């Protein structure tokens, strides 16, 4: 890195804060690289540490990450934290991976991190979204594979139908794959 590095503060806030601040890095000085030291959303609707990083929090983090990725020219590194917590022995919440003496499991935040880290482009693409919908999105292009990667976070409690059109400069003949992270409501 040939630019000065800046460390942003630890951002452990409510899901609402993350949804309202997806543009957090939009106005940063473009001459410096930023390390977003630690970030995590946690709901205040419960005091149970294990339940504080739930789907609501994970979707808010995904929305925030669209802004981080959109500003990849400035945000050089970003780190979810804290990473591990032993069930029943926590100092804080949220945590990405929970464990006890016999097993471990990833929180919804773990799956957001996995989806984002396994779907990276070489550079980001400009995109517009209709203002009628409050969805969070980022687009990138993978020069090695020729893939266009579109990430969309819909933190709302309802589905939204969206249309995607791609600029003529890309040859998009071929197949498309979709990964989703969503809540399943069981009816009893």
Range-by-range predicted roles:
Residues 134-172, 178:
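Carbohydrate-binding surface patches
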Residues 8-12, 37-40, 80-83, 153, ...:
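Active-site-proximal beta-strand/loop segments in catalytic clefts of secreted hydrolases
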Residues 32-147:
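Aromatic/acidic polysaccharide-binding cleft in carbohydrate-active enzymes
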Residues 1, 13-18, 41-46, 84-89, ...:
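Flexible loop/turn segments at secondary-structure boundaries
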Residues 2-49, 131:
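Glycoside hydrolase catalytic-domain groove-lining segments
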Residues 1, 21-25, 64-68, 135-140, ...:
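Generic recognition of flexible, low-complexity loop/linker segments
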Residues 20-22, 48-57, 92-93, 97-99, ...:
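Composition- and surface-driven signal marking solvent-exposed, interaction-prone regions
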């Amino acid at each position: 890195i040939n630019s000065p590095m800046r460390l942003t503060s630890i951002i452990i806030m409510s899901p609402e804060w993350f949804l309202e601040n997806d543009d957090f890095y939009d106005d940063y000085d473009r001459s410096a690289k930023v390390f977003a030291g630690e970030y995590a959303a946690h709901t205040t609707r419960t005091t149970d540490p294990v339940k504080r990083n739930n789907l609501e929090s994970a979707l808010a983090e995904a929305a925030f990450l669209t802004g981080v990725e959109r500003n990849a020219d400035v945000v050089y590194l970003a780190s979810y934290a804290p990473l591990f917590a032993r069930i029943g022995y926590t100092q804080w919440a949220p945590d990405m991976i929970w464990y006890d003496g016999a097993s471990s499991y990833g929180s919804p935040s773990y799956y957001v991190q996995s989806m984002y880290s396994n779907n990276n482009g070489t550079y980001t693409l400009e995109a517009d979204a209709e203002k009628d919908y409050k969805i969070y999105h980022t687009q990138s292009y993978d020069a090695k594979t020729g893939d266009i990667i579109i990430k969309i976070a819909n933190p709302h409690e309802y589905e939204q139908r969206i249309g995607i059109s791609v600029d003529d400069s890309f040859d998009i003949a071929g197949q498309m794959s979709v990964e989703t992270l969503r809540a399943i409501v069981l009816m009893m």
